[in-house]
Amino acid sequence: MAVGKNNNKMGKKGGKKKAVDPFSRKEWYDIKAPNMFNTRQVGKTLINRTQGTKIASEGLKGRVFEVSLGDLNNSEADFRKFKLIAEDVQGKNVLTNFHAMSMTHDKLCSIVKKWHTLIEANTAVKTTDGYTLRVFVIAFTKKSANQVKKTSYTKTSKIRKIRSEMISCIEKEVTGCDLKEVVSKLIPDSIGKDIEKTCSKLYPLQEVYIRKVKIIKRPKIDLGRLHDLHGDSITVGADGEKVDRPDDYEPPVQQEV
């Protein structure tokens, strides 16, 4: 039987580990939007520094960033969101390209109308540079100028004709364009305005919008085309600065090693 108390306390195995700040191993990269938008500097993103075989720039490729069109074009009120995907890294700049577009949930809820017919259509179209897009459009019927009746419902046969006309307009607007031109049309929503004008011959429409656009098939990344989209935003990072020296300059001889 042990008598007394053992004052020799044994330390715990391994001891207490020192807390390491996880942000000390990370670095910031600038997110650059294509030149279709007014604001080129979208924001910043974090990634772990290059360690061994884990290269930081490779980990950034494929990241998707969602940005409001209001922030991209410096407008106060806009209800569309663009998704940009990182395709290349130049120095500390992440070069992005268009990935998808959608409307905000609040806007979709605000345009739904009672006593009107909701008409939706979607189709897959291919651009000239090899992208396959699925485009969704939404529209509502509208009262005629001299209409007395409270409701503005239309027949199913006419809905089919309107839907067919919508798909024809989308194919006409997208098929002959590359991705850059398509995005340039999505920013002011000129496709939705053309659909409203064309389909109003069949039945008066209102609140016609391109509701969503997503890429369902993309070609192999063309870095030359991507760099053309970013142009002036590409800067090559260097550790030092260029120094002008005369043609007969000779470096000094090092005396000691």
From Swiss-Prot:
InterPro entries: Ribosomal_eS1, Ribosomal_eS1_CS, Ribosomal_eS1_euk. One of its GO terms (molecular function) is structural constituent of ribosome. It is found in: Cytoplasm. The keyword DNA-binding does not apply. Residues 237-257 are annotated as: Disordered. GO terms for biological process: translation. Keywords: Cytoplasm, Ribonucleoprotein, Ribosomal protein. Coiled coil: none annotated. The keyword Transcription does not apply. Residues 239-248 have a biased composition (Basic and acidic residues). Its main location: cytoplasm. GO terms for cellular component: cytosol; cytosolic small ribosomal subunit. It comes from the Eukaryota. Component of the small ribosomal subunit. Mature ribosomes consist of a small (40S) and a large (60S) subunit. The 40S subunit contains about 33 different proteins and 1 molecule of RNA (18S). The 60S subunit contains about 49 different proteins and 3 molecules of RNA (28S, 5.8S and 5S). Belongs to the eukaryotic ribosomal protein eS1 family. This is Small ribosomal subunit protein eS1. It comes from Caenorhabditis briggsae.
